[in-house]
Amino acid sequence: MRHATLYRYQLPMDSGVILRNEKLTQREGFIVELTENGRTARGEIAPLPGFSRETLEDAGLQAQALLEQWVKGHAIEWDAQHPSVAFGLSMAHYELEQALPEQGNYYVAPLCTGDPDELLPVLNNLPGQKVAKVKVGLYEPIRDGMLVNLFLESMPDLTLRLDANRAWTPAKALKFAQYVAPSLRSRIAFLEEPCQSPSESIAFSIDTGIAIAWDETLQEAVRDADFALENLLGVKTIVIKPTLIGSVYRVEALIEKAKTLGLQAVISSSLESSLGLNQLARLAHKLLPNEVPGLDTIGLFRAQLETPWPNSSLPVVALQEQSIVWRSESSL
């Protein structure tokens, strides 16, 4: 017996969340719920504004059409769907197959925002491997460089992951690097997408010795029918945001290929709700158990959805309180 429900959720965001220069006041998305043979599983479909090509409406319509096929017993062609739809539906399918472990990798790289004087004690108290993330490119590159230098200089055992979201011209990227001491640059694990083109980013890495990572470049490349990971040269790390990449099966294959190429792979969030974030933590535990995932985004929300994130004090809203967009009537 198969049954499916499609919910639409809305969650309030913290006032300071800005995506591609647009303020995000609430996060909207869908939760798909699949039931088969007495087992129920869920997945989150939430296109990321400014990053996903598909709109929320596009995703909802496609999800409903696929669910109508699924309850009739049809298989889903994952790679033919919008990435957010493929990921959310496949995650529910994956959980239904009992392929997703109960245990999750909740040791995440904390996202550093706010006053450095307040952050340093927090980072000092991190257990084990001290890895943190800093968003750069929002302010002047000199300020960013000085801040990164301060963190690395103050904590000799700290490693930083930086994300510029292609904000810099080559000149601005080099200006940033000038304010990070050469002796400290090796503790920048990677800098995601410093410049507006991959070739500029690679040139920056060669000039400065700062390792870079592909994020948007990977998202764009996987859309090509002839995509091959080995063609994405010049980096040692790929950042995988499943909502922007596609199905969980595609994510699995991408990680396996990265391993054969000697690339580091990191699973990262696309501002999923606590429900989706918990599933990403479980997926990270299964596929990359020794890698710190980039999932420290729950603090950007003002509420959680159904499944609370460990140690978060944010209020939790029930899935049943969200609107039902579609529900199957008959099933096999």
From Swiss-Prot:
Catalytic residues identified in the record: 135, 241
Broad enzyme group: lyase
InterPro entries referenced in this protein's UniProt entry, alphabetically: Enolase-like_C_sf, Enolase-like_N, Enolase_C-like, Mandelate_racemase_C, OSB_synthase_MenC1, OSBS_N
Catalytic activity: (1R,6R)-6-hydroxy-2-succinyl-cyclohexa-2,4-diene-1-carboxylate = 2-succinylbenzoate + H2O
Entry binding sites for Mg(2+): 163, 192, 215
Family: Belongs to the mandelate racemase/muconate lactonizing enzyme family. MenC type 1 subfamily.
UniProt xrefs under PANTHER family: O-SUCCINYLBENZOATE SYNTHASE (PTHR48073:SF2), O-SUCCINYLBENZOATE SYNTHASE-RELATED (PTHR48073)
Protein name: o-succinylbenzoate synthase
Upper lineage: Bacteria, Pseudomonadati, Pseudomonadota, Gammaproteobacteria, Vibrionales
